[in-house]
């Protein structure tokens, strides 16, 4: 079955002459004559398997293109926020499913889900499609509704201004299937203008994807009378907790197991695991069990011996990774929280960069880009094999990440820890600036500024 799937979904390549599209005769929706639909199953680098469909009618000239995901719905939905400031931002490739919604707050533009088919386009192409759709019947509107036509003309000018970068604007792409993507122009560094986050789908989104019955309603979970009562936190740490949930793979009922665990010379972490008895799907995740520390922590590890690669590492979602020797930067949300080793962390980083770099290794890529990416990945392999001395830096503004010391409780000569005060921007990203951490039990009701005061 796996071999058949590989044969169907081929990688895009000009040298693969066997990857010809399937041609199917179909009725044109405009003139009702016989047209031609071309279907091709392919795999998009750093994305997933997709089904490309293109229709063309030789009689009336009608054309239509569509993309459908060939993958299952992902475990979580995806929200991507891109700040468009430079010309290269307009050229970023964008992939979305038909269930995705797009919003541009500066234009008060919202494209709801299922109003457009899934497609592979660019950031600029999103606005071009809106501009083209609004411009279609403008001549008729000027005759029938001059005032409405003038308002649309003014709106089209705003869209043109955004496409020409007359002003900075924001694109928000929300896809409950998780099958969406916006290209990072530089795979080696953190994308400074793009934020990717994953979220749990709400009931409406689950109904949209047919993951919930149309008549299903949100249920209020009542505490079970048989639930164990813990006398202390230490008692709770000895118990493996079970939570009912749906399997993200087959969507059948299963459960998540969770247990707090103490890491020596560090703090408590929460280990969560899921194993579905129906389809065999498994997943593991580690979360910090403590509060956000007063200071951030920057840990530097010199990779010189095999023991350094075998060090245990707890990386939280907010922890960024960098290797100065090869000019590598990986943002905090690029890799999910995990408990692994230095070698495992580097291997996971390489696998993600290797998949993402496929955008720069295709037929349209320049020779210089191909050689630069190939050389970069080779250097990362040399670091993992200890052929190239390097220093890995883990920077966690919450201070909740951990790297094992080989000489604890004594100082480790190849492990350096530096504590620092977070910036205002880092506190704002963590939501600390809006928290009331002192006398929070004495909160007074706040009146809205625009609310009229009673005399």
Swiss-Prot record:
InterPro entries given in the database record: Znf_ZPR1, ZPR1, ZPR1_A/B_dom, ZPR1_jr_dom, ZPR1_Znf1/2
Chief location category: nucleus
A GO molecular function held by the record: protein folding chaperone
GO CC, alphabetical: cytoplasm; endoplasmic reticulum; nucleus; sarcomere; striated muscle dense body
Alphabetized SMART domains for the sequence: Zpr1 (SM00709)
Keyword Metal-binding recorded: yes
Single Gene Ontology BP annotation: protein folding
Protein name: Zinc finger protein ZPR1 homolog
Zinc finger (C4-type): 28-60, 247-279
Family statement: Belongs to the ZPR1 family.
Subcellular location: Nucleus
Keywords: Metal-binding, Nucleus, Repeat, Zinc, Zinc-finger
Source domain of life: Eukaryota
A Pfam family assignment: jr-ZPR1
The keyword Signal is assigned to this record: no
Taxonomic classification: Eukaryota, Metazoa, Ecdysozoa, Nematoda, Chromadorea
